Amino acid sequence: SSWSVDQVVAKIRGEVGTKVNLVLLRNNDKIDVSITRAEVSSPTVEAEIVDGVGILTVSRFNGETAVLARAEAEKFLTAGVDRVILDLRGNPGGEVSAAQGLAGLWLDGQTVLTQRRGSEIIRTDKSTGKPILGSTKTVVLINGGSASASEIVAGALRDHGKATLVGEKSYGKGSVQAVIRLSGGSELKVTESRWFTPNGKNIDGKGIEPDVKVELT
């Protein structure tokens, strides 16, 4: 077929509970399949313990991220984990509040970022929640796909001395933008402010350099 994956998915998607009939081709034989559409949930947090090290992988930041991460962190402590790897590779970001909650596993109501317009600080965001991993040795993995909220967390944990960053330079998304709709249907994206790490570094267009450079796969 000349259809792209996105085109196929668009055809299959539909209202939850309804059925879709598919014809599959296997070894030149056609197979009719009927499936019932359902909501697909992809958790933003996955965790495992390998050789006594707790590995927390966060794929994006949304409303459930901080809650899921805290639940997994509590399991780490119950299991006696004393070292944690926070994997933010390929995480494009998401909600700042989720970044505050994730950082709150290590930070105790401390600044995770400031937003500035020119030289004026217009907003300060702090970590939320109890820092149950505050004394746990932590490594944060980043790469060129780690952006926005991922960079907020990575930058904050390093600036506060809670983690060592390992991997490759991050994406470099350190601005807050607004979209202005123009006549004729066009849009103009305007940078409203820039955000800075707790130590006052803006990474927009520059990214965060890891403490230990390693090409990660």
What are these regions (language model features)?
Residues 182-194, 209:
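Short acidic, Pro/Gly- and aromatic-enriched capping/linker segments at domain boundaries
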Residues 197:
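Short, acidic, Ser/Thr-enriched surface-loop or helix-capping motifs
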